[in-house]
Amino acid sequence: MRIVFAGTPEFAAEHLKALLDSPYEIVAVYTQPDRPAGRGQKLMPSAVKALAVAHDIPVYQPQTLRNPEAQAELAALKPDLMVVVAYGLILPQVVLDIPRLGCINSHASLLPRWRGAAPIQRAVEAGDAESGVTVMRMEAGLDTGPMLLKVVTPISAEDTGGTLHDRLAAMGPGAVVQAIAGLADGSLQGEVQDDTLATYAHKLNKDEARIDWNRPAVELERLIRAFNPWPVCHSTLDGESVKVLAANLSTGKGTPGEILSASKDGLVVACGDGALSLTRLQLPGGKALAFSDLFNSRREKFAGGKVLGQ
């Protein structure tokens, strides 16, 4: 089977690795154009491109797949199937129709819940009990196609956006290989999604990471986990930005944002309902540290009565 793979970040690269170890022929890889990265803003290849180059697989990086030239280029590859994972470009219907068996996508949620750009973080933020990977046939709509296969994992009270991402990145590749086998032998037909159950995982916005201490502690604790490692929740103290990477639910009442107490166990801050004990922080110019380490060296900065977010 001739497969074209389309993907960009590390999550997608894990899927490409599995396909390279499978019996299927990867005839080409599509990925986003190189982007400036790092302090020097040097053009850097995507994780998928780097892997493809290492395996001598032809790489295509069109700005769009909407023009006839790019579409003809894809058609010339004569793919049986296109596997799309976190590619980042919209595939018009004419592209979806090119491969003999169509296009399939690995999506990091249990569809139809959390269609869209940030399903992993939105699942943690919402307090979902479970997440997973859905392999589906692609349609012109956003994550709306018939579902071929699902794998499920529980979301623990300690999971962050990062830990859940890594777990799903490990689960998804096997599911894709299994789905391809089912398509090849005709055993997988697909289950139509119930649109009435659909929710949308809107793209993450850095502004969302600014902590609103008027919100309930339960919501903020989930948000802090969901946005770790990116974009990372933050607030201000003494006019300086403070990144909050971990927190636990605590007790106490006060003005939202008020420091209620500080100890090696954490910095307890009042919320709109309840309180949070902040256990891992990053101050400007420093690295992320357990609050116990900051408390030893910067105790005066975290005096009771001070208010975060002002």
From Swiss-Prot:
Keywords: Protein biosynthesis, Transferase. (6S)-5,6,7,8-tetrahydrofolate binds at residues 109-112. The keyword Transferase applies. One of its GO terms (cellular component) is cytosol. GO terms for molecular function: methionyl-tRNA formyltransferase activity. Its EC number is 2.1.2.9. InterPro entries: Fmt (IPR005794), Formyl_trans_C (IPR005793), Formyl_trans_C_sf (IPR037022), Formyl_transf_N (IPR002376), Formyl_transf_N_sf (IPR036477), Formyl_transferase-like_C_sf (IPR011034), GART_AS (IPR001555), Met-tRNA-FMT_C (IPR044135). It catalyses: L-methionyl-tRNA(fMet) + (6R)-10-formyltetrahydrofolate = N-formyl-L-methionyl-tRNA(fMet) + (6S)-5,6,7,8-tetrahydrofolate + H(+). CDD domains: FMT_core_Met-tRNA-FMT_N (cd08646), Met_tRNA_FMT_C (cd08704). Signal peptide: none annotated. Pfam families: Formyl_trans_C, Formyl_trans_N. HAMAP family: Formyl_trans. Attaches a formyl group to the free amino group of methionyl-tRNA(fMet). The formyl group appears to play a dual role in the initiator identity of N-formylmethionyl-tRNA by promoting its recognition by IF2 and preventing the misappropriation of this tRNA by the elongation apparatus. Belongs to the Fmt family. NCBIfam families: fmt. PANTHER family: METHIONYL-TRNA FORMYLTRANSFERASE, METHIONYL-TRNA FORMYLTRANSFERASE, MITOCHONDRIAL. This is Methionyl-tRNA formyltransferase.
